[in-house]
Each structure stands twice: as C-alpha cells, then as structure tokens.
C-alpha cells in the first residue's frame, strides 16, 4: 500500500470510521430558508408572531431570526440556571434555579417577577 501524502486525508480513510462516528455532522442544506437551522418549529414561531395584533406581515427571514434568538435566549438562561443548580450540588434544574439566575444576571432583570 502506498504512503499517503501529508494532509491528503487518505490516512484518515484507512483508519476506518471509528473516529468519525463520534463527530457530529452538520445537517445537509435544503432549499427551504432556515430549514434544519432552527430547533424551534418555524410554523409555531410564525403563529406566535401573527398572534400579535400589531404585526401585519412577517417575512420568513424575520421568523427564522426570531426563532434563532429565542433558541439562544433559552440556551443562555438554561446554562445560567444549571450553574445555580450545580452550586446547590444538584443536576436537576428547579424553579428556584431559574429565579436565582434571573436575580444574578442583569440581562434577565426584565424577567423578575414573571415566575410568580
């Protein structure tokens, strides 16, 4: 068997798929804008946007951006709440962890009192 040139990727092909199975593959691109790039259902986000009487039209790109922003927001507050749970030597998030995260992070000040 011939030696693989450095950087050619041939050596990785000979190694088999052992290392490839653990590596997450990005989703295949599709023709629909925002398809598979958002974990929230875009139809549901669009329905929520249309529920606002002040909104008359919302483009697909705007719906996608709102869905992505909501995902990032939920991810951020969940991580902060999980840190609060870890401080209490727990792995399960509880309501008090969300309350503590809201109190601890200035960016979440607008949420104070919403869980009451």
UniProtKB/Swiss-Prot annotation:
Keywords tagged on the record: DNA-binding, Nucleus
GO biological process, one term: DNA-templated DNA replication
Main subcellular localisation: nucleus
Keyword DNA-binding: yes
Keyword DNA-binding: yes
Comp. bias (Low complexity): 1-10
Domain of life where this protein originates: Eukaryota
Molecular function in Gene Ontology: DNA binding; protein heterodimerization activity
GO cellular component annotations of the record: ATAC complex; epsilon DNA polymerase complex; nucleoplasm; nucleus
Stored PANTHER family: DNA POLYMERASE EPSILON SUBUNIT 4, HISTONE-LIKE TRANSCRIPTION FACTOR CCAAT-RELATED
Function of the molecule: Accessory component of the DNA polymerase epsilon complex. Participates in DNA repair and in chromosomal DNA replication.
Name the record gives this protein: DNA polymerase epsilon subunit 4
Organism: Bos taurus
């Amino acid at each position: 068997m011939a030696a693989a040139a450095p950087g050619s990727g041939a050596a990785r092909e000979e190694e088999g798929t052992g290392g490839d199975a653990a590596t997450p593959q990005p989703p295949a691109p599709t023709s629909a804008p925002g398809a598979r790039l958002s974990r929230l259902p875009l139809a549901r986000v669009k329905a929520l946007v249309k529920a606002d009487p002040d909104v008359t039209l919302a483009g697909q790109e705007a719906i996608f951006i709102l869905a992505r922003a909501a995902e990032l927001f939920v991810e951020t507050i969940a991580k902060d709440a999980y840190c609060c749970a870890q401080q209490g030597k727990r792995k399960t998030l509880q309501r008090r962890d969300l309350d503590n995260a809201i109190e601890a992070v200035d960016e979440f000040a607008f949420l104070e009192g919403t869980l009451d």
